[in-house]
Amino acid sequence: MQAKKRYFILLSAGSCLALLFYFGGLQFRASRSHSRREEHSGRNGLHHPSPDHFWPRFPDALRPFVPWDQLENEDSSVHVSPRQKREANSSIYKGKKCRMESCFDFTLCKKNGFKVYVYPQQKGEKIAESYQNILAAIEGSRFYTSDPSQACLFVLSLDTLDRDQLSPQYVHNLRSKVQSLHLWNNGRNHLIFNLYSGTWPDYTEDVGFDIGQAMLAKASISTENFRPNFDVSIPLFSKDHPRTGGERGFLKFNTIPPLRKYMLVFKGKRYLTGIGSDTRNALYHVHNGEDVVLLTTCKHGKDWQKHKDSRCDRDNTEYEKYDYREMLHNATFCLVPRGRRLGSFRFLEALQAACVPVMLSNGWELPFSEVINWNQAAVIGDERLLLQIPSTIRSIHQDKILALRQQTQFLWEAYFSSVEKIVLTTLEIIQDRIFKHISRNSLIWNKHPGGLFVLPQYSSYLGDFPYYYANLGLKPPSKFTAVIHAVTPLVSQSQPVLKLLVAAAKSQYCAQIIVLWNCDKPLPAKHRWPATSVPVIVIEGESKVMSSRFLPYDNIITDAVLSLDEDTVLSTTEVDFAFTVWQSFPERIVGYPARSHFWDNSKERWGYTSKWTNDYSMVLTGAAIYHKYYHYLYTHYLPASLKNMVDQLANCEDILMNFLVSAVTKLPPIKVTQKKQYKETMMGQTSRASRWADPDHFAQRQSCMNTFASWFGYMPLIHSQMRLDPVLFKDQVSILRKKYRDIERL
């Protein structure tokens, strides 16, 4: 019985196998016959429809789905042959072995330093607004030169941002235009900016012309094509991204615990087919509609309904229920999946919103990855492990989440909030490669205030900057140099400048006194100056302009600078107290005369006031202490146009210094004690000091406020209501218990 069953099973299997071979052979022969008939009919101009029982040809069932700039547009006529792909790839990888050592001429940078030349714009050439902003940022920077013979780096005026052939911004015949440039030199020492490259269906990283030995500052660049220590990966930004300044991050205060309404969110397009569709098509597996809200829509492109699947209607309905901004500001983590290209606008949006980015874009070289440690600000995921993302982020400790969130705000404000910062960061990275002996280290790039405000030309030692004392375990300086700005001749021994000099010299923290003689009269004889226990150095300014008081003089031997106007009235006790306060806040301006700014709605401009109000945003440098690094930053970071304005008006230098320090620290200055007698309306009426009583003086300061705010691109000044007084100040206790007892008598 068992043998019969075995024979029956073998016979059935053999019959099935024979039938399979038979019908398969017929199908194969029919297919070959059909292809021959098609070939024959093609030659004779005839067409025969294929039988219904033929095997389906799946590529025909999936029609091309063509996006551009993340806005879907279908153009089924676009076809890329294998030969065209090979040509595109060859142009991409032709200079793949380029590095700074092999494709960059360092000798051009040795003579004049790091200078950048922008080619003159050619008549008739259209330039997109985004590229105009890039060129404007370069031309407004301290690196710019209009003389190509002084240049170390060259930037094209031809718009290379959008190299998608379907884009209306695409510049045709770029290859011949670039080759005709007499300074091109096969791209050597050239930098090319690019946001979009390639087109449907592959989105290769081909920019459409031979870049030769040029460097690429490129968005959505892959790790495979990225040339380390040569190219620069930049973020993908929209045409509405501000040119300068930009909005600050949305994190106004830290919440403990740092959890928001949603754990993980995303809202964006769902690509049904093609490159970039795999991850977005699978997001619904992770979406739970509660604390993980991942929304996609099929409604994009002209013919989206032709490609819709059974889930589209449900996804579209769910998509409309949520407001993207509300989700963004109430989420702990934001998913940043790849689009058609590796980069996404969601990346910068998440950074600004203090929503920790969860990256799902395998192979993307993250922006400025050469200097930024993204593990401190983002979660780097893997597209292949999508289903593990929720459990991964839930396992992150709250302390780590808070640190990640704070770092997103720092990176956004330091490097990404404007086109100017993106461009300057790119240039600073290249400069660090050229001058490696004074390049910034990882701590500078990843800690406040960031690489753009810490100039390595000042010093290669972090302890010489006021921002890293805690990181290095150092104590702030114990001595200061008093710099007195003198503009009136010395005619009497009772002049305020001499009393001020003696009071400063008596301070236990004073190392030396420098008198900056900006008076038109000759220097007084040495015996006219009072005898002091510390050295007194008199420097005669060559140009005798207002900005000269902030020059980085080699004579200043201490890190702390006590800046004084010649008619300031301060006692030794007040000097000592201000300096001890500054030692706790070495990165800020600490002093006595406070002023404030406000927005004038009627005039739609910024205003300046010296009224005694409950808050302030400036401490004038007529009686203030700050770090001497700000002298170097004032001289070498600020543009000549602002300093020339200050010198021509002989005014506003103190306002400009406050703008600079607040822009760097993102913090207000600190006022000490309630002293109010330092007022512009109470200054002397003689000689050059009469500028304080000049009716135009106050109007000039109003104008300066708006000019400075325009250059910075935003208002960096921050209001504060904090005033620091000595312990037991004005308390009803014995005067013997008070350290700075003389301050109460003033």
UniProtKB/Swiss-Prot annotation:
It is an enzyme of class 2 (transferase). InterPro entries: Exostosin, Exostosin_GT47, GT64_dom, Nucleotide-diphossugar_trans. The keyword Transferase applies. Pathway: Protein modification; protein glycosylation. Keywords: Disulfide bond, Endoplasmic reticulum, Glycoprotein, Glycosyltransferase, Golgi apparatus, Manganese, Membrane, Metal-binding, Signal-anchor, Transferase, Transmembrane, Transmembrane helix. One of its GO terms (cellular component) is endoplasmic reticulum. The chain crosses the membrane at residues 8-28. Residues 29-746 are lumenal. It is a single-pass type II membrane protein. It is found in: Golgi apparatus membrane; Golgi apparatus, cis-Golgi network membrane; Endoplasmic reticulum membrane. UDP binds at residues 267, 269, 271, 280, 319, 324, 346, 349. The keyword Transmembrane helix applies. Its main location: Golgi. GO terms for biological process: antigen processing and presentation; axon guidance; basement membrane organization; blood vessel remodeling; BMP signaling pathway; bone resorption; canonical Wnt signaling pathway; cartilage development involved in endochondral bone morphogenesis. It catalyses: 3-O-{alpha-D-GlcNAc-[(1->4)-beta-D-GlcA-(1->4)-alpha-D-GlcNAc](n)-(1->4)-beta-D-GlcA-(1->3)-beta-D-Gal-(1->3)-beta-D-Gal-(1->4)-beta-D-Xyl}-L-seryl-[protein] + UDP-alpha-D-glucuronate = 3-O-{[(1->4)-beta-D-GlcA-(1->4)-alpha-D-GlcNAc](n+1)-(1->4)-beta-D-GlcA-(1->3)-beta-D-Gal-(1->3)-beta-D-Gal-(1->4)-beta-D-Xyl}-L-seryl-[protein] + UDP + H(+). A protein binds at residues 166, 203, 300. N-glycosylated. Glycosyltransferase forming with EXT2 the heterodimeric heparan sulfate polymerase which catalyzes the elongation of the heparan sulfate glycan backbone. Glycan backbone extension consists in the alternating transfer of (1->4)-beta-D-GlcA and (1->4)-alpha-D-GlcNAc residues from their respective UDP-sugar donors. Belongs to the glycosyltransferase 47 family. This is Exostosin-1. It comes from Bos taurus.
